[in-house]
Amino acid sequence: MVDAKTYIGNMVEVKIDRQMGTKHPKHGFIYPVNYGYVPNTVSGDGEELDCYVLGVFEPLETFQGKCIAVIHRTNDNDDKLIIVPENKVYSDEAIRALTEFQERFFESIIINKSTEN
């Protein structure tokens, strides 16, 4: 199992399996951002490590970007990487606002370079 925090500050290749504008397969909400995973990883839920891709405003199939933070769910074993184009910056408040469509169902903290220790 991979520790999601080790990705903070690093470039990451993401495979997008839920493009922005598509509907969640079980819950019916629309993804306002691209959502995917890091291939060949295993996270706390036994599946690949999930990622939100922020700062890109078109549907993607793959994306290489920088991990600026991790959403660590405190009531679920499924951390999410926050991946952005290199040199983009998002505040914790902006990350919360952009991921609220799905994260509102969970309790979480945002871990970034300044809070990871």
Give, region by region, the residue ranges found by the protein language model.
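Hydrophobic N-terminal alpha-helices or hydrophobic patches in metabolic proteins across all domains
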Residues: 1-117
